[in-house]
Each structure stands twice: as structure tokens, then as C-alpha cells.
Amino acid sequence: MRKRISAIIMTLFMVFMSCNNGGPELKSDEVAKSDGTVLDLAKVSKKIKEASAFAASVKEVETLVKSVDELAKAIGKKIKNDGGLDTEAGQNGSLIAGVHSVVSAVKIKVGALETTSGISNELKTKITEVKSKAEAFLNKLKDGHTELGKKDASDDDTKKAIKKDNSDKTKGASELEALNTAVDALLKAAEGEVEAAIKELTAPVKAEKPSQNN
């Protein structure tokens, strides 16, 4: 995100350098392109800043969702005294509870994104989709609490719940896979909003067609 902000600052600088401030009188926050198009830099900069902040928040959600893949690698494992991992089959209750906590945090963060003002209908739809998929996953874990909500949850049942590339996904992994797909789509849309805002500054001026006087 720091690199993105630096790029935005550079873009604004280039706009100042390339714009023609001659012609009609402009307000302090306005510049004019060579074709006469007037840009309100305050509004455009605000749009870029808001879109970037929203995309950063979505990235946080995506990072949480993807972290479940790393947690799934600990199924049937324990820490050894040398810092590595050793086998400890059938003791996955705490691991499942940790995944539940992560996805619950996703649901809360997505709920906060729903309250963001000024976002597009496309983003609103994709936010709702992520929230719905998170709820579906949490409900699936709740439905399987008999097998999953105990200290000695088996490796097989745990894989079915939190390992999204497992062959059997009947205890939550299928819902987790759907959540991943939904959050990927939301992040792509959010980043698209940033690019669109930047493009408003950098879109090339259309060349005027030469007059054809006979």
C-alpha cells in the first residue's frame, strides 16, 4: 500500500506538470488539461484516497481468510523441542476453534465495510457475498460441533472442515472454498476502483481530428 500511495503522489505531480493552466480562470484546486478539460484535484485526490483505504481494508480481510490455509497445515501436528513440528494425531479441537475465531473476525470486518459510504453497488453486492459465505462456514462448523467441538477432533474430520483442497469437504471445507472465491472477487473489484480513480487523472487527452476544409 505504501508503494501505491507513492505512485499516486507521483501521478498527481505529473498531472500538475502536464496540465495547461492557461485559458479560463481556475480555482485553486483545479487544473486544466491541454484539451480544456478541468480537473478538480481535491475531489479526484479524495476519491483515490478513499478507494485506496477501502482496498487496504479488503486486503486485511483477504489476508485473514488466506491464513486459514496456513492453519490447516497444523492438522495433526504439535511443536517439538527443536522448534519443528511433530505428529500428534486426533488433537485438533483448539485448531478448529482458532479457525472459527479467524473467520468470525472476517465477518466483523466485512460488516464494518458494509457501512462504508459512497461505494459502488458492485462492491456492496460483493461485500454481502463475502459476509454470507463467512456465515455459511461458521454455521457449518456449528452444525458439526459434535465431531469438531471437542479437544480430540480427528484429523480426518478436521481436514473435511478447514482444508479447502481436501477430497472430502463435507464439514466446512466446501464453504471455506466458497469464502475464498468471494473474497478474491471483492479484492479484485476494490483494486479496480483504485485503478479507475487513478485513470481519471492519467487518461490521455483525445487528439482533435484535423479540419478537412476543401
From Swiss-Prot:
Species lineage: Bacteria, Pseudomonadati, Spirochaetota, Spirochaetia, Spirochaetales
Signal sequence, start to end: 1-18
Further facts: Genes for both Vlp and Vsp families are on (usually) unnamed linear plasmids in B.hermsii HS1.
Location in the cell: Cell outer membrane
Region Disordered, annotated ranges: 146-172
Gene designation per UniProt: vsp24
Lipidated sites in chain (S-diacylglycerol cysteine): 19
Chief localization: membrane
Keyword annotations of the record: Cell outer membrane, Lipoprotein, Membrane, Palmitate, Plasmid, Signal
Lipidated positions per record (N-palmitoyl cysteine): 19
Membrane topology: Lipid-anchor
Family to which the UniProt record says this protein belongs: Belongs to the variable small protein (Vsp) family.
The protein, known as: Variable small protein 24
Function statement: The Vlp and Vsp proteins are antigenically distinct proteins, only one vlp or vsp gene is transcriptionally active at any one time. Switching between these genes is a mechanism of host immune response evasion.
One GO cellular component term noted in the UniProt record for this chain: cell outer membrane
